[in-house]
Amino acid sequence: MSDRFELFLTCPKGLEGLLIEEAVGLGLEEAREHTSAVRGMATMETAYRLCLWSRLANRVLLVLKRFPMKNAEDLYHGVLDVDWQDHMLADGTLAVEFSGHGSGIDNTHFGALKVKDAIVDKLRTPQGDRPSIDKLNPDLRIHLRLDRGEAILSLDLSGHSLHQRGYRLQQGAAPLKENLAAAILIRSGWPRIAAEGGALADPMCGVGTFLVEAGMIAADMAPNLRREQWGFTAWLGHVPALWKKLHEEAVERAAAGLAKPPLWIRGYEADPRLIQPGRNNVERAGLSEWIKIYQGEVATFEPRPDQNQKGLVICNPPYGERLGDEASLLYLYQNLGERLRQACLNWEAAVFTGAPDLGKRMGIRSHKQYSFWNGALPCKLLLIKVLPDQFVTGERRTPEQRQAEREQAAYDQTPNEPQERKFNKNGNPIKPTPAPAPVIEQPRLSEGGQMFANRLQKNLKAMSKWVKREGIDCYRVYDADMPEYAMAIDLYHDWVHVQEYAAPKSIDPEKASIRMFDALAAIPQALNIDKSRVVVKRRERQSGTKQYERQAAQGKFNEVTEGGVKLLVNLTDYLDTGLFLDHRPMRMRIQKEAAGKRFLNLFCYTATASVHAAKGGARSTTSVDLSKTYLDWARRNLSLNGFSDKNRLEQGDVMAWLENCREEYDLIFIDPPTFSNSKRMEGIFDVQRDQVQLIDLAMARLASGGVLYFSNNFRKFQLEDNLAERYAVEEITASTIDPDFARNGKIHRAWKITAR
């Protein structure tokens, strides 16, 4: 047998350039790139070394023979001419893989059968012994590739694909293959950073593939050191002594690497179900002293190495499979960029994405981009230096716009620099006092309109100190204070949401219409908001699902803040906006009590309470609602704040869901509708009639020491007396109503319920 062999190293598409550098470094000679492969010449020692040390190859194929072929008979005889007795025993096992087509072979299964027949016929003994097929663990795995009329017959030295290192027995929903992860790390400069003693953090680590591959690179561990079964183990050309020598060298290098002070390598994962599988993978790789995995959200990501060293932040954000829609992904990327800018200054970052356009939403420029393929999906690796001069603020402006801004700044003699942001005790930004607005002549109001404007301004003044102190962004400024102006007016940052209550039949419709027009003329002036930002709806008594039906179809969402969280409201499309303002104190209470708890939100609507619970450090949140529309909205709210996988969203009838639920929760919030008769429900829900069954089912899921909060806005609601006989029930309505709803004490009622 020759001292030098032709080798083919296969790899994922896009890794050829990296693989040829690695292979040449390991001893491959006359190396050339091919599509998804590298070809070269090597000794048996180099072939073994490539099997052991290649972080990027899928397979190491040793070419046994090349021969021309025009038809199936040429294929059969070409394989038959090989001295197979030099490669395997007559009673051994084999598997055959065939790729390519042409020369009369248009079916790979047929081609594989012809190769198998030739090998079996060559080795069949007079006694009837012959090789058998074992597709899973054969003694030899033979590969034949048909390329433009030439057959390339090879022995697969690797056996199973080399990306299967043996440590990742548990994986998440959309894992990266280990060799692709290694390639991304190499392209990201991790070998250089590790050699300098730098740190590595993955804010979306899943089951830790990036972490383990990074640890093996840093500790000089051969990626396939722990593999026990190889494609050459039963090959008659195998040289055990040579293999043993190379394997022992790799063991010694790994021992020396692991004896060094471990680098700071940390992973954070939102989904609690992936934490232990990730830790198990790290332990199987022998890197428990180097790598730690914690539960954590992107929204709270902040790497803090022991010695304050900088390093590499690397991650593979979901492409849509895990989060569901593009809007959620947009918020995720925005949060990632925000955390990089705020918590990772002077670090390097590498973001591997199947949605490169979303990478632009991070607000940081990438200085290099590399193309990769994750299976059949084209992807980009964005390399980022987290430095202030790379931050992108605001929208892109033309040179003319920038010049106009400079001229305006010079004219005003005001430095064009951002002011330092200040925050109130609830974590909301305190808005700077705006410059005086230019004086614009306003249309003259009617007597009734002026009276209404005066009332609005009086209410604003009365609430101004409370609004400023609490950092309230959305609040009610008027709620039918004057009977002749029957409407509710809510401020949503710089928008106004007006709900006209349907006038009783005793009121002259013409007079009601005049008053409405007077009010609409007064609102922009009194609240100092452009009339284009005033949204008006009529609120009537709702029945069935009418309260959830679309009023319009603009699909415009506005972002508001409350208690340090960001929420999306839609002021146009539905009667309600996605945020029940009267429940603000309840949401703040939940945020304060949620730390470390399992939170359940029933009839969750847009899951604003779940967002507050996640902000407060809830161990997990589960939100249940019958409406897919509102659950999609809820997903956006969670993603907007960087909360994702550990926050479950369940579509279903709450009563049926509770009957099938077997989990326990420490904190439960129930805010049911007064009435519901959706087609997706088995029956009709009536809060007065069904309250006992609902609360009993929920209390059965309440953990020891847990708290259930029950609230509803049915004005005639009466809590059943027998509930207080079984549970500790305390009405807390007064503490759940803020000053903006103090004029309407019946806006809702709320109770705290615990086990006796």
Swiss-Prot record:
Main localization category: cytoplasm
Biased composition (Basic and acidic residues): 395-409
Enzyme class per UniProt: transferase
Ranges where the record places region Disordered: 395-441
Catalytic activity field: guanosine(2445) in 23S rRNA + S-adenosyl-L-methionine = N(2)-methylguanosine(2445) in 23S rRNA + S-adenosyl-L-homocysteine + H(+); guanosine(2069) in 23S rRNA + S-adenosyl-L-methionine = N(2)-methylguanosine(2069) in 23S rRNA + S-adenosyl-L-homocysteine + H(+)
Enzyme Commission designation: 2.1.1.173, 2.1.1.264
Keyword rRNA processing belongs to the record: yes
Domain THUMP: 46-157
Annotated Gene3D superfamilies: 3.30.2130.30, RNA methyltransferase domain (HRMD) like (3.30.750.80), Vaccinia Virus protein VP39 (3.40.50.150)
Annotated Gene Ontology cellular component terms: cytoplasm
SMART domains attached to this UniProt entry: THUMP (SM00981)
Keywords: Cytoplasm, Methyltransferase, RNA-binding, rRNA processing, S-adenosyl-L-methionine, Transferase
UniProt-recorded Gene Ontology molecular function terms: 23S rRNA (guanine(2445)-N(2))-methyltransferase activity; RNA binding; rRNA (guanine-N7-)-methyltransferase activity
SUPFAM superfamilies in UniProt: S-adenosyl-L-methionine-dependent methyltransferases
Compartment list: Cytoplasm
Purpose: Specifically methylates the guanine in position 2445 (m2G2445) and the guanine in position 2069 (m7G2069) of 23S rRNA.
PANTHER family (alphabetical): RIBOSOMAL RNA LARGE SUBUNIT METHYLTRANSFERASE K/L, RIBOSOMAL RNA LARGE SUBUNIT METHYLTRANSFERASE K_L
Family recorded in the similarity comment: Belongs to the methyltransferase superfamily. RlmKL family.
Name the UniProt record assigns to this protein: Ribosomal RNA large subunit methyltransferase K/L
Originating species: Pseudomonas fluorescens (strain Pf0-1)
Gene behind the chain: rlmL
